[in-house]
Amino acid sequence: MNIRTLVALWKANVPHWVWIGSAAWIGAVLLGLDGRTPDWGHLALFIVTTLTIQSAAEFANSFTDRKEDRIYGPTNTLVTGELDARIAKKMLIAQNTVAALLLLALLLITLNYALIAVMLVGWFFGLAYSVPPLRLKETLHGPFSHAIAFALLPIAGWLIVEPSLIAQNGFIIAFAALLFLHSFGLGITLKFRKTLLALDSGLIHMEQGSSVYSIGTVGFRLSFKTAMHLEELTSLGAFILIPIFWYLGVFTAAISIALLALPLPLTAAAMILRMKDPIKNSSKYKAMMTLSWIFIVVILLGAGLATVVSPGYAVLACAVSLAGFPLLVRIVHPWGSKSLNGRY
C-alpha cells in the first residue's frame, strides 16, 4: 500500500470531525477526574478504542456515500479516485474488526459495563447513520442518530474515570442533553445543505409559483419549512436548558456564561440568516451552526483543562483545538461543496 493510498484512507476517516469530536470526551475525562489521578492503562486503551470507533463511523459514511458524493461531496477520496473502493471496503471491515477487539479488551480489563454499553450504542448509531440496511440518514431518524452518537462521547469520557453519572450534581447528563439537542439541530442543517445542492444540480425542482420552503428536504422526508422549525426548536431549545442548569447548580457560572456568550449568538444569527434567504445565505448559516456546535464541545474541553492547568493555558489549548478543525478541513476538502469556501 503506497503513501497516496494511506493519505486517501486518512482523509476518508474525516480527521477534522474526529479531532473536534475528541474535545467532548477529553473535556469529560478531565472533569470526571476532579483532580484525581487516572488509571493510565485503562485511559490509554479507552483513548485508542474511542478514536478507532470515531474514525470507523466517519469512514463508513465516506464509503457508503461514494456515489451520491459526486454531487454532495466531490472531495471524497472515493470520488476523486485517490482511493479504490475495493481497498476501502477491506480497510473498513478491518477497522471495525479492530474496534470490536479493542472494545472487548476494554471490557475485560476494566469490567466497566456501563462504559462499554455507552460505547456500543454510540458505535451502533455511528454506523447505522450511513450503512445499509438501516442507513438512518435517509430517514426521519437521521438527526436523532447523528445527535445520539455525538452526545454519548462526553458520557463515555466521563465513565472511564467516574462510575457515577450523577456525580457533581449530574453535570455530564445535563451537558449531554444540551449537546444532543444542538447536535439534532445541526443534523437538520446538514440536510438543508444536501437539499440545496440537489436543487442546484437539478435533482429536485420547485413547482412554478412555489418557494424553497415547500420543497421536501432530501433524506429527511419533511418539508423545508417544517424541518426549519424543528431545527429552530432543538438548536435554540438547547440554550434554554443553560439558565435552568445554572440555577440548579449543575452548571457553573463560567460554563453557563461561556455557552450563552459564544454558541448562542452564532446559532441565533444562523437562524436569522436562513429565514431571510435560505438559498443566498446557505453557506453562511451552515458555517455558523457548525461553529456554534464546535464552541459547545470546546467549552467543555476548556472547563476540563482548567482543572489541571491555569486558565491561560486552557484558553490556549482551546484555541489550538479550534484552529485544528479548519486546517484539517482545508487539507481534506481543498475544493468542493464541503470545503470552507464551498457553495453550501
Give, region by region, the residue ranges found by the protein language model.
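Extended hydrophobic alpha-helices typical of membrane-associated regions
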Residues: I3-R4, A254-Y344
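Small-residue-rich segments of transmembrane alpha-helices in multi-pass membrane proteins
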Residues: I20-A28, F144-V161, Q208-G209, K286-L301
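Membrane-embedded alpha-helical segments that form the functional core of polytopic membrane enzymes
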Residues: G21-T64, A99-L104, Y113-L127, I166-T189
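Transmembrane alpha-helical segments that form the membrane-embedded catalytic/substrate-channel core
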Residues: L51-A60, W123-P133, A151-L152, A176-T195, ...
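Multi-pass membrane catalytic core of lipid/isoprenoid biosynthesis enzymes
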Residues: R70-L120, I204-A254, V297
